[in-house]
Curated annotation (Swiss-Prot):
InterPro entries: Apoptosis_reg_M-T4, M-T4_sf, Poxvirus_T4p_C, Poxvirus_T4p_N. This is Protein OPG195. Induction: Expressed in the intermediate phase of the viral replicative cycle. Belongs to the orthopoxvirus OPG195 protein family.
Length: 221
């Protein structure tokens, strides 16, 4: 019986030794990551640099590059800081593009207005005109809501990787992983490049934001 007790206790000792307690700063540091895995349909996206078009105080941005234009905005009506601070892109293989939006110091979700955590995303093919046939995809949780519409006439597949968690959970979890069909996290992170902020043009920004809002206002696609 004594040997049996020792055998049962030994794994728990190893487990307690291998798990490091979370620091207070890890528990208080929250970060948001949204990854779009896009596969082109009937065309090969050109590998390009990417750009970001955003105002200084408004809840939205436009990014272009690697074959696609993406418009993302929140539901707030008053001037404020947009929840997304960083944008990265890469083209993977001949037809895959990965776009990552992030902010690794958002603050606790409960401290952020719900309108800032309610995001609409529109994905267009930048290099191909397409027939503008849109499909919709939605992800919702208690912390964030994401609604995506994309042009399925030139996009064969669109997947979303989304995580909104503190650094403590991010360190120990196994499901906070980015992927793009069969392309793994390490490969994606190896080739991701930060997008360059372009000189702000209010007319260009307004045109694409209004176009995207009109698209999301439609109840039928």
């Amino acid at each position: 019986m004594r040997s049996l007790i020792i055998v049962l206790l030994f794994p728990s000792i190893i487990y307690s030794m291998s798990i490091r307690r979370c620091e207070k700063t890890e528990e208080e540091t929250w970060g948001l990551k949204i990854g779009l895995c896009i596969i082109a349909k009937d065309f090969y996206p050109e590998r390009t640099d990417c750009s970001v078009h955003r105002p200084t105080a408004s809840g939205g941005l436009i990014t272009e590059g690697n074959g696609f234009r993406v418009v993302i905005y929140d539901q707030c009506t008053e001037p404020h800081d947009f929840i997304i601070t960083d944008t990265q892109q890469t083209r993977l293989g001949s037809s895959h593009t990965y776009i990552k939006f992030s902010n690794m110091n958002t603050g606790v979700p409960s401290s952020i207005p719900k309108c800032s955590r309610t995001l609409c995303i529109s994905v267009y093919c930048d290099q191909e005109a397409g027939d503008i046939k849109f499909e919709e995809y939605t992800q919702e949780s208690s912390d964030i809501s994401i609604r995506v519409k994309y042009d399925s006439s030139c996009i064969d597949y669109l997947g979303i990787n989304q995580s909104f968690m503190n650094e403590c959970i991010r360190r120990i979890t196994t499901w906070d992983r980015e992927s793009c069909v069969r392309i793994d996290t390490q490969t994606i992170n190896k080739y991701l490049k930060s997008c360059t902020n372009t000189k702000f043009d209010r007319n260009v920004y307004k045109r694409y934001i209004l176009k995207s809002k009109a698209l999301h206002a439609k109840t039928e696609l």
